[in-house]
Amino acid sequence: MQRPNVDDDMTLVTDFGKTEAICVDVLDNPATEEGVLLKVMARGPFEQGQQVWIVDRDGSKVGATVENVSEQTIDSEVTLSTVLPA
């Protein structure tokens, strides 16, 4: 999976099912050497600490952890931390 860009569409698989997300920010994670923080807008009952899968276009999956959730109207701004494979 490549590092996403702002405005990229993403698919997340969670314990409540699949949901679509839009990437709004991509940052290096200072807590981990290879880590990335992804801010996405998505719908669903996300909770801090929740584990999710990010599904790439080719169907491969990368695990991520919900670091922060900010409620916005119907959508939520969700910050995910992950390590993307090289």
What residues fall within each predicted segment?
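Short intrinsically disordered terminal tails
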Residues: M1, P85-A86
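Short coil-to-beta transition motif at edge beta-strands of beta-rich domains
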Residues: N5-T11, M41-V55
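Short coil-to-beta-strand transition motifs
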Residues: V13-E20, I54-G63
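N-terminal helix initiation/capping motif
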Residues: M1-I22
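Short, basic/aromatic beta-hairpin or loop at an interaction surface
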Residues: K18-G35
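Short beta-strand-centered aromatic/proline hotspots
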Residues: A21-D25, V62-S70
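Detector for the mature cores of small, proteolytically processed
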Residues: Q51-W53, A64-V66, L80-T82
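Short, solvent-exposed secondary-structure boundary/capping segments
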Residues: A31-K39, S70-P85
